């Protein structure tokens, strides 16, 4: 039975989204390590440090939101694949 849904394409998209999410997480981790190194070495003083930390918090919150959206899209695609396969199998069993 052919529903017209390309599970391979959906699965590929899901895998690509997961890869993007992993890449985003890696960038966030690397950025965080850089910031921690800067703070520990005392390169930032007073208001400059406060400004930098505020800007970094904005960056990381946007980054977290993007990461969460990408991972939720991947999960939604996986759920869609599972549901359609279940429906397709059920219809096929009823036809046989």
Located regions from the model:
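N-terminal secretion-targeting helices of virulence/extracellular proteins
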Residues: 1-96
